[in-house]
């Protein structure tokens, strides 16, 4: 796709007009706002479902507006292009923009994200002073595959129920997928997708399927024997036909809302920080390219050869396969939204698109972004702190998850029936180690979810199910 900017700009203008009309109207909420994050042939529009949380459960959690620490964590990813975008979009009061990825280093110096997004810092010599089409110096290890995400996510327009057949992907002897580190929210992939890479990476691997599920992570995923992780819609985390088919969830990532309370101990090995390499340094990840240059870069599976050549990626490599999977998933998402059926998800290839989607989906000109903050080294086990759980935001959230690509591409969606929580976590018995201020999302209407989830969590159908959003994932709030 070339020339995405014109469609995005038109969508943003339409949103600005609607937002202005809404502000002068007595109506408190527009049932369906136009989304300004446009993909090749169409624009995404937000789903306007309101979360219906169990009052008895949510009453236990105080509502707080104290998200400044998490906002600070998310707000270090602002540059001139996003400032200009906010001006053009009349988003003048935006408090934070977006998170970035980088090297885990608390050292002082220029290029640092001050207390940063997982404490992160960009090396000055790696941050281009001028916009450039070529961001190969931000790409990890040439043709090596991208690092796996925290839990793969997929949007499927046909994902109204559990898959018709159980997955048969083999598990490794220790009960985890050999090909993946845990990932968070998988994206839908084509049947022509390849086997998952064996090297670690920061983004989730994805696969095809008419199945809507999560994998190896905060959301489990059903596996296709011929490819990698399949899909999951925001409306339902349906996955496998039965646990024997192989649900694998990142330790401690998925839990019941009713079991979230001060003193609750998370499973040993729960990881909320970015993956680290052999030298204890957070893996580098691609960054957004500048919007004016991004419009000139094709984002279309039909231009695959040109894209690989532009970024110096070897055809047939694992990374090339991941690039193809992301392009295919986003093109299918665009096609699904072309019929005016209110798709609730969008692939965003620029900060402007992310901001536009969040603003229009939440019905506000000033959305706030929050992300999980890890304090120092992660302990072996976390425990929920006293008075450590509070509700943040209202009845609508927008979650954005990174996808494996040559520059930053985010899968953003507004899940139905979801509420956001801030959870303060401390180390258990690990003196000197830090804790975390985590963001969690709870899905309060699980009546249509696959029974495998309830068996896994020893829960009853309809119980509210939550998951943490690890570093690298961003949650947008309306207030």
Swiss-Prot record:
Residue segments, region Disordered? 158-177
Which keywords does this chain's UniProt record carry? Glycoprotein, Signal
InterPro entries recorded for this chain? BURP (IPR044816), BURP_dom (IPR004873)
The record's PROSITE patterns line, in alphabetical order, gives: BURP
Q: Which Pfam families match?
A: BURP (PF03181)
Using the UniProt annotation, give the residues that carry a glycan (glycosylation sites). Answer: 445
Boundaries of every BURP domain copy: 254-479
Keyword Glycoprotein attached: yes
| Segment forming the signal sequence | 1-46
Recorded protein name is BURP domain-containing protein 4
Source species: Oryza sativa subsp. japonica
């Amino acid at each position: 796709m070339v020339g995405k900017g014109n469609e995005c700009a038109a969508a943003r203008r339409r949103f600005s007009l609607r937002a202005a009309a809404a502000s002068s109207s007595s109506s408190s909420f527009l049932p369906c706002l136009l989304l300004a994050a446009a993909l090749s042939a169409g624009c995404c529009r937000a789903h306007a479902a309101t979360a219906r949380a169990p009052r008895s459960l949510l009453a236990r959690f105080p509502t707080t507006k104290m998200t400044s620490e998490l906002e600070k964590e998310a707000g270090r990813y602002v540059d001139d292009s996003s400032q200009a975008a906010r001006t053009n979009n009349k988003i003048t009061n935006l408090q934070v923009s977006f998170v970035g990825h980088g090297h885990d280093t608390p050292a002082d110096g220029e290029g640092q994200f001050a207390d940063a997004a997982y404490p992160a810092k960009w090396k000055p010599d790696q941050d281009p002073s001028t916009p450039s089409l070529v961001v190969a110096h931000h790409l990890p290890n040439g043709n090596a595959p991208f690092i796996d995400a925290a839990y793969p996510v997929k949007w499927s327009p046909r994902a109204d129920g559990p898959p018709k057949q159980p997955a048969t992907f083999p598990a490794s002897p220790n009960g985890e997928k050999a090909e993946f580190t845990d990932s968070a929210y998988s994206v839908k992939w084509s049947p022509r997708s390849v086997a998952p890479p064996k090297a670690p990476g920061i983004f989730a691997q994805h696969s095809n399927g008419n199945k809507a599920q999560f994998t190896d992570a905060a959301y489990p995923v059903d596996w296709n024997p011929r490819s990698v992780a399949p899909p999951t819609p925001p409306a339902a985390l349906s996955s496998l036909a039965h646990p024997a088919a192989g649900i694998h969830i990142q330790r401690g990532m998925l839990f019941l809302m009713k079991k979230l309370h001060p003193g609750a101990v998370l499973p040993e090995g729960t990881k909320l920080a970015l993956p680290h390499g052999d030298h204890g340094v957070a893996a580098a990840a691609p960054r957004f390219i500048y919007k004016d240059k991004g419009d000139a870069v094709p984002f279309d599976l039909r231009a695959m050869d040109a894209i690989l050549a532009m970024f110096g990626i070897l055809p047939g490599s694992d990374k090339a396969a991941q690039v193809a999977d992301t392009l295919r998933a986003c093109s299918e998402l665009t096609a699904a939204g072309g019929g005016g059926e209110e798709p609730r998800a969008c692939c965003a290839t620029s900060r402007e698109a992310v901001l536009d989607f969040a603003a229009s989906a939440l019905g506000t000109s000033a959305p706030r972004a929050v992300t999980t903050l890890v304090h120092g080294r992660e302990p072996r086990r976390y425990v929920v702190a006293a008075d450590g759980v509070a509700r943040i935001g209202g009845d609508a959230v927008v979650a954005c998850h990174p996808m494996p690509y040559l520059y930053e591409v985010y899968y953003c969606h507004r899940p139905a029936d979801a509420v956001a929580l801030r959870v303060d976590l401390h180390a258990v018995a690990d003196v000197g180690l830090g804790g975390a201020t985590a963001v969690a999302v709870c899905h309060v209407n699980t009546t249509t979810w696959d029974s495998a989830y309830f068996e896994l969590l020893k829960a009853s159908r309809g119980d509210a199910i939550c998951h943490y959003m690890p570093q690298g994932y961003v949650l947008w709030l309306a207030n």
